[in-house]
From Swiss-Prot:
Residues 1-464 are annotated as: Alpha,alpha-trehalose-phosphate synthase. Its cofactor is Mg(2+). Active at 80 degrees Celsius. Bifunctional enzyme which catalyzes the transfer of glucose from UDP-alpha-D-glucose to glucose-6-phosphate to form trehalose-6-phosphate (Tre6P) and removes the phosphate from Tre6P to produce free trehalose. This is Bifunctional trehalose-6-phosphate synthase/phosphatase. It comes from Thermoproteus tenax (strain ATCC 35583 / DSM 2078 / JCM 9277 / NBRC 100435 / Kra 1). Keywords: Carbohydrate metabolism, Glycosyltransferase, Hydrolase, Magnesium, Metal-binding, Multifunctional enzyme, Transferase. May interact with the putative glycosyltransferase (GT) TTX_1305. TTX_1305 is required for the trehalose-6-phosphate synthase activity of tpsp. D-glucose 6-phosphate binds at R9, Y89, D143, R314.
């Protein structure tokens, strides 16, 4: 098994003369540290690691010699022309996705030509992966540039596919700004993965909510049901090479840089920040907060200095050029108004700084001022904390950075609150050394445990697990397709204790326009009676119907009944018992929301049950209803959050009911109670998937009709299911 890493850029930089050098920072550094710690992946069972990406040289200038030298290093270049780079990278990736995913929708552009370029380049990357891949390999695709690639690879190669997003995933309301076709393809593209990873639970929840809202897929227990597959969604906060930064003050090259900086900055307290030039980083607000601090705390003038490092990015792009001019202007104004002959408030560097200088700044800085307006993680915050071997220093961190979820001991601020940030600077500079040490040590312990090696290892192991689970399902599906009715009859006849769990609507009878019309015919009543009369054979009808309906039509048969999706249970010949307690407090509120939707969707109606309330839309226009379903589920989810209720989406129905009671929980209880050695389960919609999930591996699970399922076997409709059951009953 090999690992194929896929990213926009290969982890190298090509000089004008064709020299190949390792890239510094970002994914390249993270993967180098991770793979170095696990012996190139061999400790994880990986035979080889291959990296697929663009070399950074336009294809019209990329020589065959360069491509061969890259391949000799385990790097597979994807050729991109200047035109493709412009449309794919500068266009859709950085002018549409980057601003939108960071919450700056006003900066996003929506150009058809950019979307076409994005699709075309994603296809190129996917084809390069497929050409390299061998059955059983793992493919790890990185970041927003390549969100369509997982689905393309999934269709063409027998591999495990993982995707990791390094930036925030936006709320559904922001994603909705994308044209619907683009939005759908992006979500479906990501769902081609076996595993989709994010930095934080917030981003993971945003993704899952978008999938439910825009695609209608079901999300349950950290996975999304896509056909017979379960796409796992996980949280994997990226870490750093902790020891490298913790021990940096012992590195001679860093020590030398520390001495130079101390000589230059004198005895002043050092507040420090470093960012790539970008509107998401909040540099101008940070500068404003520093000015506010100096004006409100003049005693710190001459005693503290702000070292502001801005690394050039997207040079030549008008917006970025204007941003730089604004920063230059503000820094110059503040230094001119507040500076002295022997002191400047802001030491401003607009350039790339080498690693020893950066580590020296981490070590000498008293305060790190990390205040992005939005950031997927922010490793600078982690690197600063890790570098504090002497246990002295204070981190001021934006609550809008993913790192704030892990670094709770930082002074967490809102970057839009200039006054609050100024006060945090004052607090940081005045904090006692004991308090600094308490906070730093707590954060360091967390960073040491959650380092970059754990990030990579957790993701790879989770991907292997997700891949194995999918392969088991596929294997079971292939196997069951070959089973004959004769084997079913043989297993049924040989069994000592049998259990049949049968859904009602759509499974034993057809779906009707209105629930009261779906009464059982004489043939069905006779079939159920004969099956239930067999020795050691328990037949249960497991339905979303209420007790009154099931009792009225099936109560005289020797069968068990489960009503309202597992909330009520009646054993053959027994009395009804409630498996939960009905709380009426929420019902009127939920009913009101459903009735609002029913009034807007002709042909739909609300059904009030004992435990739940259902909105049926079988008779409504499908186009109108399907759109309304997503909006209804969204409205109910928000309105009933934290209420202990669940929202079930069945076939042409949405139901609100108490959580924890499903067909699956009822089936599990019956399986545990009866201990059968033959199990037959049949159902036709999403609410029946819970029964399929808890059924033992030896069970015959039957999906009635089309659609994604966990069942191992399928029949066309209720008639096919009845025909199958007829094979089991005695003559």
């Amino acid at each position: 098994m090999r690992l194929i890493v896929v990213s926009n850029r290969l982890p190298v930089t090509i000089s004008p003369s064709g020299e190949i050098r390792e890239s510094v920072g970002g994914l390249a550094t993270a993967m180098k540290s991770f793979l170095g710690a696990v012996n190139g992946g061999r400790e994880l069972g990986l035979e080889e690691v291959v990296w697929v990406g663009w070399s950074g040289v336009p294809s019209e200038r990329e020589s065959n010699d360069l491509r061969e030298r890259l391949r000799g290093m385990g790097l597979e270049p994807v050729p991109l022309s200047s035109e493709e780079v412009e449309g794919f990278y500068e266009g859709f990736s950085n002018s549409t996705l980057w601003p939108l995913f960071h919450g700056f929708s006003e900066y996003a552009t929506y150009e058809e030509k950019h979307w076409r370029a994005y699709r075309g380049v994603n296809e190129k990357y996917a084809k390069a992966v497929v050409a390299l891949a061998r059955p059983g390999d793992l493919v790890w695709i990185h970041d927003y540039h390549l969100m369509l690639a997982p689905a393309i690879v999934r269709e063409a190669a027998e591999v495990g596919v993982g995707f990791f997003l390094h930036i925030p995933f936006p709320p559904a309301e922001l994603l909705q700004l994308l044209p619907s076709e683009w939005r759908r393809e992006i979500l479906e593209g990501l769902l081609g993965s076996d595993l989709v990873g994010f930095h934080t639970y917030e981003y993971s929840a945003n993704f899952s909510r978008s999938v439910v809202r825009f695609l209608g897929y079901k999300v349950e227990m950290g996975a999304i049901a896509v056909g017979h597959r379960r796409v796992r969604v996980g949280v994997f906060p990226i870490g750093i090479d902790f020891d490298r930064f913790y021990n940096s003050s012992q590195d001679p090259s860093v020590v030398e840089e520390m001495a130079k900086l101390r000589e230059m900055l004198g005895r002043a307290k050092v507040v420090f920040s470093i960012d790539r030039l970008d509107y998401t980083k909040g540099v101008l607000r940070r500068v404003a907060a520093w000015e506010r601090f100096l004006r409100e705390h003049p005693e710190w003038r001459g005693r503290a200095v702000f070292v502001l490092v801005v690394v050039p990015s997207r040079t030549g792009v008008p917006m970025y050029e204007e941003m730089k001019r604004q920063i230059d202007r503000e820094v110059g104004r503040i230094n001119g108004e507040l500076g002295e002959l022997n002191w400047v408030p802001i030491v401003y560097l607009y350039r790339f700084i080498p690693s020893p200088t950066l580590m020296a700044l981490y070590n000498i800085a008293d305060v790190a001022l990390i205040t992005p307006l939005r950031d997927g993680m922010n490793l600078v915050a982690k690197e600063f904390v890790a570098s504090k071997r002497d246990c002295r220093g204070v981190l001021i961190l934006s609550e809008l950075a993913g790192a704030s979820k892990e670094l709770a001991e930082a002074l967490v601020i809102n970057p839009n609150d200039v006054g609050g940030t100024a006060e945090a600077i004052a607090e940081a500079l005045s904090m006692s050394e004991d308090e600094q040490c308490r906070r730093i040590r707590a954060m360091q312990e967390r960073l040491r445990m959650r380092d970059v090696v754990r990030w990579g290892t957790d993701f790879i192991y989770s991907l292997i697990s997700a891949k194995s689970a999918r392969e088991e399902v596929e294997k079971a599906l292939r196997y069951m397709e070959e089973l004959s009715v004769d084997k079913l009859k043989s297993d049924f006849a040989k069994a000592k204790r049998r259990l049949l769990l049968l859904d009602y609507d759509g499974t034993l009878v057809p779906h009707y326009p209105y629930p009261h019309m779906a009464v059982p015919d004489g043939d069905l009543l006779e079939l159920l009676s004969r099956l239930a009369a067999l020795p050691e054979t328990a037949v249960y009808v497991v339905s979303g119907r209420g007790r009154d309906f099931l009792d009225g039509w099936l109560g005289r048969l020797p069968v068990g009944l489960v009503a309202e999706h597992g909330f009520f249970l009646k054993h053959p010949g027994g009395e009804w018992k409630s498996l939960g307690k009905v709380d009426p407090s929420w019902r009127q509120y939920a009913k009101g929301i459903m009735e609002d939707f029913a009034s807007n969707v002709p042909g739909s109606f609300v059904e009030v049950k004992e435990a739940g309330i259902a909105w049926h839309y079988r008779n409504a226009d499908e186009t109108i209803a399907e759109k309304a379903v997503v909006e209804l589920i969204d409205a109910l989810s928000n309105a009933l959050a934290g209420s202990g209720l669940s929202i079930l989406r069945g076939k042409k129905v949405v139901e609100v009911r108490p959580a924890g009671y499903t067909k699956g929980t009822a089936a599990k209880m019956l399986l545990d109670e009866l201990s059968p050695d033959f199990v037959f389960v049949a159902g036709d919609d999403e609410t029946d998937e819970g029964m399929f999930e808890v059924a033992p591996q030896s069970a015959y699970t039957v999906k009635v009709g089309p659609g994604p399922t966990l069942a191992k076997f399928r029949v066309g409709d209720y008639r096919g299911l009845r025909s199958l059951l007829e094979q089991l009953r005695p003559p």
